[in-house]
UniProtKB/Swiss-Prot annotation:
Keywords: 4Fe-4S, Cell inner membrane, Cell membrane, Electron transport, Iron, Iron-sulfur, Membrane, Metal-binding, Repeat, Translocase, Transport. Binds 2 [4Fe-4S] clusters per subunit. It comes from Escherichia coli O7:K1 (strain IAI39 / ExPEC). GO terms for cellular component: plasma membrane. The gene is rsxC. Its cofactor is [4Fe-4S] cluster. Residues 369-397, 407-436 form the 4Fe-4S ferredoxin-type domain. [4Fe-4S] cluster 1 binds at C377, C380, C383, C426. This is Ion-translocating oxidoreductase complex subunit C. Residues 602-684 are annotated as: Disordered. The complex is composed of six subunits: RsxA, RsxB, RsxC, RsxD, RsxE and RsxG. GO terms for molecular function: 4 iron, 4 sulfur cluster binding; electron transfer activity; metal ion binding. Its EC number is 7.-.-.-.
Amino acid sequence: MLKLFSAFRKNKIWDFNGGIHPPEMKTQSNGTPLRQVPLAQRFVIPLKQHIGAEGELCVSVGDKVLRGQPLTRGRGKMLPVHAPTSGTVTAIAPHSTAHPSALAELSVIIDADGEDCWIPRDGWDDYRSRSREELIERIHKFGVAGLGGAGFPTGVKLQGGGDKIETLIINAAECEPYITADDRLMQDCAAQVVEGIRILAHILQPREILIGIEDNKPQAISMLRAVLADSHDISLRVIPTKYPSGGAKQLTYILTGKQVPHGGRSSDIGVLMQNVGTAYAVKRAVIDGEPITERVVTLTGEAIARPGNVWARLGTPVRHLLNDAGFCPSADQMVIMGGPLMGFTLPWLDVPVVKITNCLLAPSANELGEPQEEQSCIRCSACADACPADLLPQQLYWFSKGQQHDKATTHNIADCIECGACAWVCPSNIPLVQYFRQEKAEIAAIRQEEKRAAEAKARFEARQARLEREKAARLERHKSAAVQPAAKDKDAIAAALARVKEKQAQATQPIVIKAGERPDNSAIIAAREARKAQARAKQAKLQQTNDAATVADPRKTAVEAAIARAKARKLEQQQANAEPEQQVDPRKAAVEAAIARAKARKLEQQQANAEPEQQVDPRKAAVEAAIARAKARKLEQQQANAEPEQQVDPRKAAVEAAIARAKARKLEQQQANAEPEEQVDPRKAAVEAAIARAKARKLEQKQANAVPEEQVDPRKAAVAAAIARVQAKKAAQQKVVNED
């Protein structure tokens, strides 16, 4: 009785939530044995037929290749691809591949020579004597990948499992409608499949090996039981037919009762799963020494005259396979790669067969039914009831449609296996899987961009750190290379620092003023007076320098001399016109006369010592002489008309006469020494003389018509005469400048 209970426990199966039961439609293709397809004339082999990066090319255009010869090198997760037949490489260019959008990927195009010659094959019949690493390396080198649809490199998967795998599951469920590739393979090649399972078990060394197969494959079940009759290490588990029981997480739960955690892998719970077709490919790679160059493909649908399962070479165009099966396309014919729930429509038939191609479905119009338009979601929750991954498809639909990537990620959209059960039961005909695929692609693109940004940030920070290190090292070198100061320099530096500290201490000391006392500002006043004295000395020195550097202007000197003479005459007139009650101090008068004579001599010396850098204009000199004579006559008339209230001082008169004679001689010398560089225009000279005579007559008439009662003030007359002379000279100078 205990053994019976143990047997029941050992063969127990579990059921997952959700799932659907669509029409199977498997009888169209599982009744005929596997057959070979004639070779196509041209093969297109994409470099990437698996999850991961493409390998490195090792052939060139024009090379001759044999069947099984590697076209790329696979390193790490990169998986190599091999030539499906012998021929010549005619091109290496992008070509549309097995993808919903038929994206162009780099491919090797081979023209077959029809001989189909193999490379030398080296099989390992004694694989049990080989190490685990050698077997994994051979499986990877021969390009074996998961043939159940994912395309994950088998060697990488086995390497990642390591020693923690307790259960090896062989997926033989093949739950999707129409597809019978694994069913037919188990019927025709059951012994080879079991041999491949034993190789995998030898590599992983699990505690148990389970084969999960649905109960709708009776012939395959009987063939496997016949092969496993004498084996006790492999258990065959027959499970109820339910879609999608062939999913990795679903089949793991059905056979073991263990659930794969969200975002995790089956290896996290000690389980590793491989497909039936993958086990067969492992057997051919290890024992037969044949790389994967072909696989079983189901050709089905009412538009195909001879449906069945064929051995299709990788790289064979889909059109070639369909034509060999009697393809009869309708007006709007649709060809689906994969099953009706998880497959995708091909945009054209030149797409090649790849490692993950398990079915080509060409349904008729009756099978497709009437096309139905997408309608709004009614929140019926039928999709949530059918979801085998326990997700909320209606919520994921809204998040995907609204570009709410964070919420979609939080609701575990990555756990969606894209089985299509939700879309199958949706009464609004919403293509939910299409939305989920697009959302996954957008999230993957965002993460890739974030990864690139993080890498760029890391590179930038590393560069900044390197620059900081180089800067610190450079400063350290400069510091170590600096010359140490001598003893006297150190003393000077110390003294300077002491002075600075003393000043700072003085500046920070508070000013205290006692009550009733006035602050002593004598030091500040003395310092200010010293600064003023220094400024005056500096200004005087600068003035002397400017006087020595600047050459005296003759015209300016003459003007200053005239002003000095006017001031002297003004003083003499003031003394002559002074009231008799106010006696003149002889000493003061003598001092003033001496000062006037000194100023006059100084001006005469400046005029005599000035270099004649500019030649005197004869016309200008003549005008000035005429103006001077007119002013002299005017002064004589004023003096003659003035009442002699006071007696004229003989000494002052003698001084004035001497000054007048000196000025007259000076003007005559200037006129005599002036070089006639330019000829005087007679007409202009006559005009100027006439103007001077007119002005003189006008002045005489004004003086004659003056009221005798109103006496002329001699001081005002002298000032007016001096101003007139200065203005006349200035006008003459301006005229000369304008003529030049």
